[in-house]
């Protein structure tokens, strides 16, 4: 594969290929080598112009994308991201990761991703509404409940999802589950806002139970969290509910480090949620910054002190190799990515070396640890298809079961095809990559995508 202008996609591709080639998979199934050059190319890439009107009446233009990467297991499924950094490399990386993440859930979903370089920050609600509707007017021809089902991601809130859903309904004159993350009154699912954050915590609980053979739980564990969007917010709340101590939360402007022994408390997380609803920064809260330690322009990892667990929940490549080494020195034993590819390639290498050598910082990759969001999106699709709504408890139980299954798939496949190192802790990175790849490759062969 030669794509020097697509560094994020290259990184994601090399991670998958590295896991597979370093394992025994191709010794057992040499025919699967033929899949790699095929699976690395999207089935379809859409790029389109989005023109919209700002509050001053000016015509504005942005670029929109949808990468429909792989549909062997089901309709394309993956979020839409509105952020000025969005480009084809980032969306191909996210779509590629989504293929394997969706496969791990066991639900009938293919992989895709989309978005635009539109920046919601600094825009009025009316401008965001007009852009969202204009975006859907370009995208609606290529999506549908049986074809491609987008959802939210960075910059695409429930407000945006609902305006896109409404525009699709008007354009198609039909009421269907064409997007997920909808309002409960319009076919949304219980637990969807919480799903990714809750899922990360459920996954970490299985890591702790597996490693300690049930002797330890989350209770009393010190947790560093980055980000302050949905994933970070609900991961923090679930950690607190499980008796853990949340030591940090952050945004693009800086990090808030807890100064109290109890860590951040639910009321403070809810205050941060209210700030984010107004598209404000943590730094805008004088009370939080006075009670705790706010560091402008910083990330948690080298500032948080001694911790047991790190949950990167902000964006890709947010943990560098140096920060990974610092986390290990600070006593970190578990890292679970709430963000997609949250650890840089160098950080993954540091964590995996630690795991294999016996120091034992155990990394859970995003495609496994943060699959809870798309899992509940899949459950929302199922509810829409049945014209039914499941209770909060029903969806939460299904989410917990899916996260347990993903963990068990990852450990079982890693144990079968990979060397676990001196401490016999299986590589969740390799296990998740290989387990997802096996499912997709088998389905692709069944539908004639390779032979």
UniProtKB/Swiss-Prot annotation:
InterPro entries: Aminoacid_DH-like_N_sf (IPR046346), Glu/Leu/Phe/Val/Trp_DH (IPR006095), Glu/Leu/Phe/Val/Trp_DH_C (IPR006096), Glu/Leu/Phe/Val/Trp_DH_dimer (IPR006097), Glu/Leu/Phe/Val_DH_AS (IPR033524), Glu_DH (IPR014362), Glu_Leu_Phe_Val_DH (IPR050724), NAD(P)-bd_dom_sf (IPR036291)
Active site: 113
Assembly behavior: Homohexamer.
Keywords recorded for this protein, A-Z: NADP, Oxidoreductase, Phosphoprotein
Superkingdom: Eukaryota
GO molecular function: glutamate dehydrogenase (NADP+) activity
Residues carrying Phosphoserine: 252
GO BP annotations, alphabetical order: ammonia assimilation cycle; glutamate biosynthetic process; L-glutamate biosynthetic process
GO cellular component terms, A-Z: cytosol; mitochondrion; nucleus
Catalytic activity of the protein: L-glutamate + NADP(+) + H2O = 2-oxoglutarate + NH4(+) + NADPH + H(+)
Gene encoding the protein: gdh1
Matches recorded under PANTHER family: NADP-SPECIFIC GLUTAMATE DEHYDROGENASE 1-RELATED
Taxonomic source organism: Schizosaccharomyces pombe (strain 972 / ATCC 24843)
Record Pfam families: ELFV_dehydrog (PF00208), ELFV_dehydrog_N (PF02812)
Family: Belongs to the Glu/Leu/Phe/Val dehydrogenases family.
Protein name: NADP-specific glutamate dehydrogenase
SUPFAM superfamilies, per the entry: Aminoacid dehydrogenase-like, N-terminal domain (SSF53223), NAD(P)-binding Rossmann-fold domains (SSF51735)
Enzyme Commission number, as recorded: 1.4.1.4
